[in-house]
Amino acid sequence: MHQAQSDLRRPLLILLAFLLTFPVSISATDERARERNAMVHEQIVARGIKDSTTLSAMRIVPRHLFVPVAQRPYAYQDRPLPIGYGQTISQPFMVAYMTELVSPGPGRKVLEIGTGSGYQAAILAASGAKVFTIEIIPQLAEAARERLDDLGYGGVAVRSADGFYGWAAEAPFDAIIVTAAAEFVPPPLIEQLAEGGLIVIPVGSPYFVQTLMLVQKRDGKPYSTSLMPVRFVPFTRATK
């Protein structure tokens, strides 16, 4: 009788051990998905972002995997977070806002200046765009390349270079997103923009509030519209 009870308990104990072990990761994954959905609903949709492609990408891409481990508890809060080397990952709303402005999608070719951790590039790729991204800090560029590849966004082309000069070999681009504040729009970026294309860029002093600008190329000339006050890290140039 004792042996029979023992035999019955054994599979139950094995099942209990399995349930105690594996749901931890599943539960954590579900919790992060809930956090992302809440982020989209409370921070992004509530502030007027409507593009379904952008919203879908924001729900899918795991922002917590694009920040240092110490910052992951705050990954789905509406604020920028430090990622090292004096750089930050933009707040979720700003990423969604800039993404919606350029309307990424299949067939669209988008250049990003300022890869950082790769989050904005992942959002653009998840929206269906063909993405090229430039990061001036080699360590960030390499880490972003590996991270994007590990998360299934290996199609994103990452390059370490001075973003001021764009990526002439891959031009023209349908859209260019700049994630650092420049004192003016770099002329090479305008040159590399397709006719009718858009540049989204924060313009102004790196020490004060800047203005997010939307630049459209029409008849070969740039036409700018001021959108909102913003604060971005400075546009870093290569030292001579």
What are these regions (language model features)?
Residues 13, 40, 186:
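Generic structural marker for isolated residues within well-ordered, non-membrane alpha-helices
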Residues 2-14:
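Bacterial N-terminal signal peptides that target proteins for export
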Residues 5, 24-26:
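Intrinsically disordered, low-complexity segments enriched in Ser/Pro/Gly/Ala and basic residues
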Residues 103-223:
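Conserved nucleotide-cofactor-binding alpha/beta core module
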Residues 2, 66-68, 197:
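Short amphipathic alpha-helical segments with coiled-coil-like heptad repeat character
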Residues 11-23:
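Bacterial N-terminal signal peptides
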Residues 26-111, 119-123, 127, 140-142, ...:
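Class I SAM-dependent transferase core
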